[in-house]
C-alpha cells in the first residue's frame, strides 16, 4: 500500500512539474528573416532585456519551452512584426504570418484562442500621445475623466464579452484588465504633467489650474505603487518615473519652496537625481524592479556615462541576488570597454575633414569629394538607431574599399558633445571621413534634406563627383540592396 501511495505521489509531482512549463511550437509563414526574438517574463515582471534570440529551422518551425508557474505574457518578434501572447502552462501550437493583418496573421491553438487575437488588436498608442489627444478634446478634469472612462470601458468590454462567453480564462482577463487600467492611469497622470511643463516654459500662456494640481495628487494617492501585478504592465515603469522625477522631485518641492534645480547640463547629476529618487520613493520588490529598469534604460542609450557603473555597483550591493542584474551587466561591460577605447589614438583610417568647423553648407562639404563616390551617414551620439547601424559598418567598409569609394560621417551633435563624438568614433571603429556640424551647416542640411525646422536621423546619402545623387539612401543593414544602390553610381 505504501509503495502504491509513493508511486501515485511521484506521478502527481511529475504532472505538476510538467504543468509549470509552457511549450510553444511556432510555424512562420512568409517570414523574411529567420531570426526570432522572444521576450519572456522575469521574476514575474515585464523586464524588457529578458530576451532570447533564436532561429527557426529549415521548415520555418521553432519550438521552445519556458517556465510558466502562471499565465505569462510573452513577445515574439520576426520580420519587423511583434506579436504578444498570454500563455498558460501547457502546449501551444501557433502559426504566424508576419506580413499579414492581425486577423490573418495568427492561428493559435491553445488556451484563450480568441483572446490572443483581441490582445494583438488592442490599442497600444503610447500613453503620452493619448494624454495629448485628450487635452485637445477637453480642458476640464471632469470632462477628461468622462472621456477616458468611456474609452477604457469600451476596451475592457471586448474582453468582458469573451470572458462571459467562456472564450478566455479569468487569469487571462485579469492580466488584460490590469494592463488597460494601468494604461489609463498613466494617461491620466500624464495630463497634469504636460500642463505643468507647458506652464513652466518661458513666455508660456498655459495656466496650470488648481483643479489639475489637485487631480494629479489624488491620482497618485488613490493608486499607490504597491501592487506587484503592475510590474507586468506596459506603462508602469514610465508612470513611476514621472511620479518620482516630476511630481515628487519637482512639483511638490516647488510648491513648498524647497526645490533646488540640478545642473541638467551635467548628465551625471541628472542620472544621480533620478536614481536617488527611485531609491527614496519606492520600497520592496517595486523599488528593485524600478532601479533595475532605470539602469537598463540609461545604459541602453549608449552614452557610456561612468556614473552608471557606480550606480550599478550600488544596486548590486543592495540586491546581491537580484534576478535583474545579469541582464544589465553586459551593458556595464560596454561602458568599461568604451572608456578603454577612448584612451587610444585615432586609427590611421579615421580622418577629419580639413577645417571642418568652417564648412557651412552641404555644397561646400561635397566639393571636398570631387571625383569620388561617397556614402554618407548622418548620425549623432544620442541617436540609438544610428548606433545600431554601426554593427554593419565593417562589411560596408570592405565593400566601399573594394570599389574605391569613400565613407563620410556627418555628426549632428552640438559643441558640448565634441569629446563624446570623438570617443564614439574610436569605440565604434568608424573608418572614413568625419565632420561635426556647426550651426550654419546644421541649418543648411535641414533646409536641403528636411523641412528647415527639424531633422530625423539616421539619414543616408550618396554623393558622386561632388554632387548629391541620392538623398535617401538605404541603410547599412540593408547590405546587398545598399551595395547595389551604391554600385549604380560608381
Give the ranges of each region predicted by the language model.
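Short pre-active-site segment immediately N-terminal to redox-active cysteine/selenocysteine motifs
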Residues: 372-374, 378-382, 414
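A non-transmembrane, solvent-exposed segment enriched in polar/low-complexity residues
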Residues: 20-175, 179, 187-188, 227
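Conserved redox-active cysteine motifs that mediate thiol-disulfide chemistry
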Residues: 378-395
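N-terminal, charged low-complexity regulatory/assembly segments
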Residues: 142, 146-273, 277, 281
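Conserved segment of the thioredoxin-like fold in thiol-based oxidoreductases
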Residues: 398-442, 450
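Thiol/disulfide oxidoreductase modules built on the thioredoxin-like
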Residues: 430, 439-487
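Bacterial Sec-dependent N-terminal signal peptides
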Residues: 1-26, 489-490
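N-proximal helix/coil linker or "cap" segments that precede and/or mark the start of modular domains
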Residues: 296-372, 423
Amino acid at each position: 500500500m505504501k509503495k502504491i501511495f509513493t508511486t501515485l505521489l511521484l506521478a502527481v509531482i511529475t504532472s505538476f512539474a510538467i504543468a509549470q512549463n509552457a511549450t510553444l511550437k511556432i510555424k512562420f509563414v512568409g517570414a523574411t528573416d529567420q531570426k526570432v526574438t522572444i521576450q519572456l517574463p522575469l521574476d514575474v515582471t515585464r523586464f524588457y532585456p529578458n530576451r532570447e534570440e533564436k532561429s527557426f529551422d529549415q521548415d520555418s518551425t521553432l519550438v521552445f519551452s519556458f517556465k510558466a508557474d502562471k499565465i505569462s505574457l510573452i513577445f515574439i518578434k520576426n520580420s519587423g512584426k511583434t506579436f504578444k501572447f498570454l500563455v498558460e502552462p501547457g502546449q501551444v501550437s501557433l502559426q504566424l504570418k508576419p506580413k499579414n493583418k492581425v486577423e490573418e496573421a495568427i492561428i493559435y491553438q491553445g488556451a484563450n484562442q480568441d483572446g490572443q487575437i483581441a490582445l494583438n488588436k488592442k490599442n497600444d498608442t503610447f500613453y503620452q500621445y493619448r494624454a495629448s489627444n485628450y487635452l485637445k478634446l477637453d480642458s476640464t478634469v471632469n470632462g477628461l475623466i468622462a472621456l477616458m472612462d468611456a474609452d477604457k470601458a469600451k476596451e475592457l468590454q471586448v474582453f468582458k464579452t469573451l470572458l462571459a462567453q467562456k472564450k478566455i480564462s479569468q487569469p487571462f482577463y485579469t492580466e488584460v484588465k490590469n494592463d488597460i487600467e494601468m494604461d489609463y492611469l498613466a494617461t491620466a497622470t500624464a495630463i497634469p504633467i504636460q500642463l505643468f511643463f507647458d506652464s513652466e516654459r518661458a513666455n508660456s500662456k498655459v495656466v496650470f489650474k488648481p483643479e489639475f494640481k489637485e487631480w494629479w495628487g489624488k491620482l497618485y494617492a488613490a493608486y499607490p505603487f504597491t501592487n506587484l501585478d503592475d510590474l507586468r504592465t506596459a506603462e508602469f515603469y514610465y508612470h513611476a518615473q514621472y511620479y518620482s522625477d516630476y511630481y515628487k522631485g519637482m512639483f511638490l518641492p516647488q510648491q513648498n519652496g524647497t526645490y533646488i534645480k540640478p545642473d541638467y547640463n551635467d548628465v551625471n547629476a541628472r542620472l544621480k537625481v533620478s536614481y536617488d529618487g527611485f531609491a527614496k520613493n519606492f520600497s520592496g520588490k517595486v523599488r528593485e524592479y524600478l532601479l533595475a529598469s532605470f539602469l537598463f534604460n540609461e545604459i541602453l542609450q549608449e552614452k557610456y556615462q561612468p556614473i552608471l557603473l557606480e550606480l550599478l555597483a550600488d544596486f548590486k550591493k543592495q540586491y546581491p541576488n537580484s534576478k535583474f542584474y545579469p541582464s544589465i551587466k553586459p551593458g556595464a561591460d560596454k561602458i568599461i570597454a568604451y572608456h578603454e577605447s577612448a584612451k587610444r589614438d585615432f586609427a590611421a583610417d579615421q580622418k577629419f575633414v580639413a577645417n571642418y568647423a568652417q564648412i557651412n553648407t552641404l555644397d561646400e562639404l561635397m566639393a571636398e569629394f570631387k571625383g569620388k563616390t561617397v556614402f554618407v551617414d548622418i548620425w549623432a551620439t544620442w541617436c540609438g538607431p544610428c548606433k545600431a547601424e554601426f554593427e554593419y559598418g565593417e562589411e560596408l567598409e570592405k565593400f566601399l574599399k573594394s570599389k574605391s569609394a569613400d565613407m563620410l560621417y556627418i555628426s549632428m551633435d552640438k559643441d558640448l558633445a565634441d569629446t563624446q563624438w570623438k570617443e564614439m568614433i574610436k569605440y565604434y571603429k568608424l573608418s572614413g571621413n568625419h565632420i561635426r556640424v556647426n550651426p550654419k551647416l546644421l541649418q543648411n542640411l535641414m533646409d536641403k534634406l528636411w523641412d528647415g525646422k527639424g531633422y530625423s536621423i539616421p539619414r543616408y546619402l550618396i554623393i558622386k563627383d561632388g554632387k548629391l545623387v541620392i538623398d535617401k539612401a538605404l541603410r547599412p543593414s540593408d547590405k546587398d540592396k545598399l551595395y547595389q544602390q551604391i554600385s549604380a553610381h560608381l
